[in-house]
Amino acid sequence: MSSIIRYDWTAEELHALFDLSLPELLYRAASVHRQHFDPAEIQVSTLLSVKTGGCPEDCSYCPQAQRYDTGVTAQKLMDVDAVVAKARQAKLAGASRFCMGAAWRSPKDRDIPKIASMIREVKALGLETCATLGMLNTCQAQALKDAGLDYYNHNVDTSPDFYDSVIHTRQYQDRLDTLAHVRDVGLKTCCGGIVGMGETRQHRVGLLLTLATLPAHPDSVPVNLLVQVAGTPLHGTQTLDPFEFVRMIAVARITMPRSMVRLSAGRESMSDELQLLCFMAGANSIFYGEKLLTTANPETERDQALFQRLGLRPMHLMENVSNKDQHHGNVHADIACKHVV
């Protein structure tokens, strides 16, 4: 199957891919994947919550929204020294990229200098940096860029026509605007969504269509499987068929051939066999560590054992070729789990 980078995908084309038999879809996705990546290499990332809970938004899936009784206690923004200590520990464990997340609608201008200090201090350790802080304006994005930030994560979450069923406090266009601000200042983008929220296949097609027709494909595409947290409105939602999740990964790989397709939240509930199918479908990135912000993640020992069983190895450094060729020569580096052979 051709791996030409396209930005003109149609909903009809994506539906046709989803409708293929699963073996045929896996074959096509794997063929595209092998044209750009080593199928035995998996990028492994880590994430630290630098400001937990108390978010004013109403995202129906999120345990950090202050309006939901989920047992998450709001905390202040961490001190720079504490973040640097965590980053130093990550580096000793083999990290080459350190991600910082804050439960904000958007950072206040007064918060930017402290975040910038975190970025500079982490960068000084020789680590790549990424952040997910909510909506940004151009000035804030530029300040983070000037501090040395490499990646910015801002998900669109779902399709435009399902979005209002999940979130009411932020518009879909707000998310697209933040992505534009991030791209405009030269930061690399990480953008994906969540499935298993009660959406239909049409909505999953709509999510991927949004991502695959952006002016530049995201450098990383996190695909999250809903983690149902008691107290959130989506707790009790019917679970997604695992094979439908695999189809989501495969179509993401075909439509965005050069992007890192990341298994993100929800991996704790996935069997080793399901994760293998996802890797065969083109997923080539995972989050590594026992916690993703406030939700559980597989223990590092389980991931190490899985890599050994499957003959996989962590991706250390790779040349990241942008889909619009604006990032030639940039290094796309994430955590390396050095104890896995």
Curated annotation (Swiss-Prot):
Subunit structure, as described in the record: Homodimer.
Lineage, top ranks: Bacteria, Pseudomonadati, Pseudomonadota, Gammaproteobacteria, Lysobacterales
Family annotation (Pfam families): BATS, Radical_SAM
Amino acids binding [4Fe-4S] cluster: C55, C59, C62
Family to which the UniProt record says this protein belongs: Belongs to the radical SAM superfamily. Biotin synthase family.
Cofactor binding, per record: Binds 1 [4Fe-4S] cluster. The cluster is coordinated with 3 cysteines and an exchangeable S-adenosyl-L-methionine.
Pathway: Cofactor biosynthesis; biotin biosynthesis; biotin from 7,8-diaminononanoate: step 2/2
Family annotation (Gene3D superfamilies): Aldolase class I
Protein name (Swiss-Prot/TrEMBL): Biotin synthase
Keywords carried by this UniProt record: 2Fe-2S, 4Fe-4S, Biotin biosynthesis, Iron, Iron-sulfur, Metal-binding, S-adenosyl-L-methionine, Transferase
Signal peptide range in chain numbering: none
GO biological process, one term: biotin biosynthetic process
Positions contributing to [2Fe-2S] cluster binding: C99, C130, C190, R262
Amino-acid biosynthesis is among the record's keywords: no
Naturally occurring in which organism (per UniProt): Xylella fastidiosa (strain Temecula1 / ATCC 700964)
InterPro entries according to UniProt: Aldolase_TIM, BATS_dom, Biotin_synth/BioAB, Biotin_synthase, Elp3/MiaA/NifB-like_rSAM, rSAM
